[in-house]
Amino acid sequence: MAKRDYYEVLGISKDASKDEIKKAYRKLSKKYHPDINKEEGADEKFKEISEAYEVLSDDNKRASYDQFGHDGPQGFGGQGFNGSDFGGFSGFGGGGFEDIFSSFFGGGRQRDPNAPQKGDDLQYTMTLTFEEAVFGTTKEISIRKDVTCETCHGDGAKPGTSKKTCSYCNGAGHVAVEQNTILGRVRTEQVCPKCNGSGQEFEEACPTCHGKGTENKTVKLEVKVPEGVDNEQQIRLAGEGSPGVNGGPAGDLYVVFRVKPSETFKRDGDDIYYKLNVSFPQAALGDEIKIPTLNNEVMLTIPAGTQTGKQFRLKEKGIKNVHGYGYGDLYVDIKVVTPTKLTDRQKELMKEFAQLNGEEINEQPSNFKDRAKRFFKGE
């Protein structure tokens, strides 16, 4: 099935501004969000809206889409950030097929080594308690990352000196190398090892960063954790990644959350579950029992005749949706607890109850000692 035009999906014109795109996305995503709209097809509609917004809200992706449509050179599909491999924080990089092809055979489209390039994105894993995730918090984190050198301001040259044409590649930024391969001896082009592709070298390198233009430092950042975040969810801190190259923008920092389980509740999305043990008399006669919620304690009415497995729903007593779509519910699961130790009087009452109910009880010993007594009595 052919994909619909992204502008048509959001119901906007092709010259719509970023604010108009965002406004249309918010309106439609709220209408078709799976947590709100339970109609058939709402989930697919929401995915289509999210995919359209991801492309049209990004200047580069939008420009490529306007030129090539869905069959653009990169394709579009709402992949987003891949948070499957966590562990502290790390950079993201790697070239595509064209880079591999070009490095092996040479030729192909050459990148301008002096063009502005966005810095690498970084990732940090933050551990939260259940309460911190539910109510939100602000935490300070420390990460090691590359920052712009304060001495040379990212230039790489010693202040007061200038750059000159690289003597190794004569300013080309790349050098020809011959290699023995399975196809025979091939001539390839590689990035100049002296100037790293810039085509320039320093008269004298910066004494602080040794020509890199960056320093690796420990940086402290304040992270505001929104209410309702769940395990494996993430937030993006724009511009807090590695510094850009040649005046390009800095990358972003993605904070991925690890949420510890609660000792009281079990979480499922925005809903929470609480297990409540009730005694046999409470279940049979009914009662009012005080139970915990996220914010306080409330009285729960247990109707007479309540059985194990009965579930009560307390609307909007769950967790606030992180996207602002209301609150989840609190579900109370009932378990009727059978008494294990009874006094003689309690046993008499239970037998009397059984007789009144027309039941014959063949009482069984509860432990080895009782079984032994009955054995020697010949019972």
Swiss-Prot record:
Top-level taxon in the UniProt lineage: Bacteria
UniProt KW keywords: Chaperone, Cytoplasm, DNA replication, Metal-binding, Repeat, Stress response, Zinc, Zinc-finger
Cofactor: binding details: Binds 2 Zn(2+) ions per monomer.
Chain sites annotated for binding Zn(2+) 1: 149, 152, 206, 209
SMART domains: DnaJ
Pfam families the UniProt entry points to: DnaJ, DnaJ_C, DnaJ_CXXCXGXG
Cofactor(s) this protein requires: Zn(2+)
InterPro entries in the cross-refs: DnaJ, DnaJ_C, DnaJ_domain, DnaJ_domain_CS, HSP40/DnaJ_pept-bd, HSP_DnaJ_Cys-rich_dom, HSP_DnaJ_Cys-rich_dom_sf, J_dom_sf
Entry domain remark: The J domain is necessary and sufficient to stimulate DnaK ATPase activity. Zinc center 1 plays an important role in the autonomous, DnaK-independent chaperone activity of DnaJ. Zinc center 2 is essential for interaction with DnaK and for DnaJ activity.
Stored HAMAP family: DnaJ
Similarity field: Belongs to the DnaJ family.
Assembly mode: Homodimer.
Role this protein plays: Participates actively in the response to hyperosmotic and heat shock by preventing the aggregation of stress-denatured proteins and by disaggregating proteins, also in an autonomous, DnaK-independent fashion. Unfolded proteins bind initially to DnaJ; upon interaction with the DnaJ-bound protein, DnaK hydrolyzes its bound ATP, resulting in the formation of a stable complex. GrpE releases ADP from DnaK; ATP binding to DnaK triggers the release of the substrate protein, thus completing the reaction cycle.
UniProt protein name: Chaperone protein DnaJ
Taxonomic source organism: Staphylococcus aureus (strain NCTC 8325 / PS 47)
Gene designation: dnaJ
